[in-house]
Structures are given as C-alpha cells and as structure tokens.
Amino acid sequence: YQRQYAWNVNPQLELLWEDIERVAKRIDEDRMSVVPHFMGAMVIAQIKTFGKQVQAFEIIDGQQRLTTFSIFLASLRDVAVEGKSKYATELQKYLINDGVMEHPEIERYKLWPSLTDRGTFIAIIDPEADLDGIVPKQHDDGFVKKATLAHEYLKDVIRKHVFLDGSFDEHRFETIFEALKEGLAIVSIELEGGDDPQTIFETLNSRGVDLSPGDLMRNFIFQRAKGMGQVGGSLNVDKLYEKHWFPLDRPFW
C-alpha cells in the first residue's frame, strides 16, 4: 500500500543508466577488479505462507528501486527478444516464478506492486497475461503511467547500447546484464517479529522521491488494517484499498 511508482526519466532513470553503463565499462576493461556499485538499502519483512504458497516478503522500504530494477530486467528481456538472443529466456527467470503455487495468478510474479500500478506493471513484465483476471477493471484516466515511460526509456537506451549499425552485439548486451546482476549492490535488511514496520517506514531516509503526507497516511492506515485480524491477509485488505483509497490515488484533472 505504498505510493505509486514515482521515478522520472530525469533525473532518476538517467542517473541509474549512467551507473550501469559505468559498471559495464569496468567489467569490459577488467572484470576481476570491479567493485560493486552501492545502490542503497532495502528493508523487508517475511510474510507467513502456508502449504504450496511461494515464500514472500513485504517491502517496507526500497519499493521504488526494486520496481525499477524489475522494469529494467523486462526492458533487457524485450531487447534480447528483438535481437534473438539466448538471454531472453534467462532474463524471464528473474521476473517470473515457476513450479507449484497456491495462487499462480499472483505468486508467479516476483514482485506484486500496489494496486494503482499493478495493471501497468504486469503488462510490462508479462505482456501475454490476462489482466482482467488479475486486476480490477480500471478506467482510462488519459495519463501515461511513469512505469510505462520508464520501460520505454530503458528499452531505448539499451537498444542504442547493444545495436551497432543495426546488428545486435551479444557481448555488449552481456556486459549490461552482468553490470545489473553482479556490478550493483543493495543491502537487504530483514525485520524481526518484534519490529514495527510502520515506524521504520516513516523514519527511513532514501535517495528516491520524497514521501508526501498522503503516502505516509495511506501506509499507516493499511498497515493497521493488516494487523486487525483480516481474514485471508493482504488479499482482503486489497479490496479495502480498492474501495476506499484507490479513488484518491487517481488524478483529479
């Protein structure tokens, strides 16, 4: 129940691409001497799962970065498909879970974003998905989602990097993939049972886009709702969010 995806092409995505290009260049020059580029920290809390459910974690802080990296992976995959690269199948493994699941329509996705971005995000990650069976029907508000803009921008810069004179350069593609996979580092902090996720969420400072009072209020309300004995866990709270808060997240004009 965090805010909508908020990263812009300028400055966040441009800076991210510069970091990745810089790391890729170092890998190409001397792979053994590359020191991972630190991208900040993320805070997670394990969600109780049962039976065939996929192990899951709630993102307390780091949602924007994790969403961005997922979009970047999808962009890499899409360019790999265009270049008929063997990496297209490999990249899909970082976006989609496989195996036996309790709720495959949800659990097959490595990342399950907030309701306002869910349809857009899944369309990027899994273009063949049946969106009507996964997310509620959303009205066309006439706005292009920032996740869509991010996807188009990242595909464009990756294409320019790996297509030389119209030909797909497998080596240049590999170095970008390696830069993302091995050359960037994020510290993952997992909360313990006695930690208060809401307090930690409010006090953490990140390098991303500042939280608004509405972002803090929304997170507080739905964290409290999750702790009030909701039957079925977050899926029922999703319905509460859709009915009472989702209209507030839509553009007013």
Tell where the protein language model's regions lie, with residue ranges:
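Covalent nucleotidyltransferase
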Residues: 1-253
